[in-house]
């Protein structure tokens, strides 16, 4: 799958995948700076499933040692942005 064209597109796709893992979450109320577990019921199995969804959705390998970077929307977007080169300004 192609990398998102912008940071906004990346965020929209991540929130869509998050909703698939945690369907009871209203993704419009997710606060980017707070860890998911502080905002809603999100346990270690959810983190694993979220990492798997991100892998499938973006085609990015996410080693288990990097799962801690997926614990908030802000850190997840930063991690994926580095992996995908998304949201970088053009020349």
Regions found by a protein language model. Give the residues of each.
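Phosphopantetheine-dependent thiolation modules in NRPS/PKS and related acyl-activating systems
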Residues: 2-42, 49-51, 56-91
């Amino acid at each position: 799958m192609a990398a998102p064209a912008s940071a906004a597109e990346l965020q929209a796709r991540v929130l869509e995948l998050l909703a698939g893992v945690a369907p009871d979450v209203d993704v419009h109320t997710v606060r980017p700076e707070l860890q998911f577990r502080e905002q809603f019921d999100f346990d270690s199995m959810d983190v694993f499933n979220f990492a798997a969804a991100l892998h499938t959705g973006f085609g990015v390998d996410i080693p288990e040692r990097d799962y801690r970077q997926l614990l908030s929307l802000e850190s997840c977007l930063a991690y994926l942005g580095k992996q995908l080169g998304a949201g970088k300004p053009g020349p």
